[in-house]
């Protein structure tokens, strides 16, 4: 998305991908005009690298969906975009005569997509008697949201290390601080899924 948008706007983009990323994905992003490298870092370390590198160039901007103190505006915009996908899903459900689903499952890495989906459906179904169960699913190797939910003290948790999983896009060990607030208050269930679950589809 970032490389595509930068290309359309005539801007330069640099993408740091975490180890375990495929050469195919790297090439697809590069085809959008970005400078792309696969680093020997996990996802969260790549975010820190991108943040550092953005400060070394004039007008450098980090475009990232994970938030931390002092970096919330762009992640909020991205989460609003994810909310559009939730709205489109709700419209399709209604078109198929499904007034209220029984369950909504959403994947999570840093939790931005999950926070948007959970927030959207919490609001949409706030006045119905039987609300859907909102279920957040993470890769077991990077289950930071799950660990925060299990701790049950309202604080986010960080998972460190290689975060090795076949669920490459979900190998994130540090939660988005904005979405964590939504998830801890509105998600019904957090699931830590091992790779064999993803293999089964």
Segments predicted by a language model, with ranges:
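Active-site/ligand-binding-proximal alpha/beta "capping" segment
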Residues: 57-125, 181-184, 192-201
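Short Gly/Thr/Asp-enriched flexible loops that form oxyanion-binding sites at enzyme active sites
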Residues: 2-9, 114-125, 132
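Short, acidic/small-residue loops that bind anionic groups at enzyme active sites
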Residues: 10-25, 103, 124-141
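Glycine- and other small-residue-rich loops at beta-strand/loop junctions that grip anionic moieties
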Residues: 14-18, 39, 63-64, 74-78, ...
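Active-site-proximal loop->helix
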Residues: 1-53, 145-158, 179
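Active-site/ligand-binding loops adjacent to catalytic centers
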Residues: 44-47, 51, 55, 59, ...
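Short coil/turn connectors at secondary-structure junctions
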Residues: 9-13, 32-34, 56-60, 99-102, ...
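Buried hydrophobic positions in well-ordered alpha/beta secondary-structure cores of metabolic enzymes
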Residues: 6, 29, 89, 104-105, ...
């Amino acid at each position: 998305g970032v490389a595509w948008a930068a290309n359309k706007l005539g801007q330069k983009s640099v993408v740091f991908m975490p180890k375990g990323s495929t050469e195919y994905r790297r090439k697809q992003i590069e085809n959008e005009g970005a400078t792309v490298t696969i680093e020997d870092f996990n996802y969260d370390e790549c975010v820190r690298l991108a943040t550092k590198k953005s400060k070394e160039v004039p007008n450098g901007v980090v475009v990232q969906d994970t938030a931390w103190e002092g970096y919330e505006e762009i992640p909020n915009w991205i989460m609003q975009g994810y909310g559009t996908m939730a709205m489109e899903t709700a419209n399709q459900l209604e078109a198929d005569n499904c007034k209220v689903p029984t369950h909504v499952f959403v994947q999570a890495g840093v939790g931005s997509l999950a926070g948007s989906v959970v927030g959207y459906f919490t609001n949409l179904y706030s006045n119905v008697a039987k609300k859907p169960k909102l279920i957040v699913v993470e890769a077991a190797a990077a289950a930071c949201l799950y660990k925060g939910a299990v701790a049950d003290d309202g604080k986010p948790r960080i998972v460190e290390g290689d975060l090795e999983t076949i669920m490459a896009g979900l190998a994130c060990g540090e939660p988005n601080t904005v979405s964590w607030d939504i998830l801890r208050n509105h998600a019904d269930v957090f699931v830590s899924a091992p790779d064999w679950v993803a293999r089964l589809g």
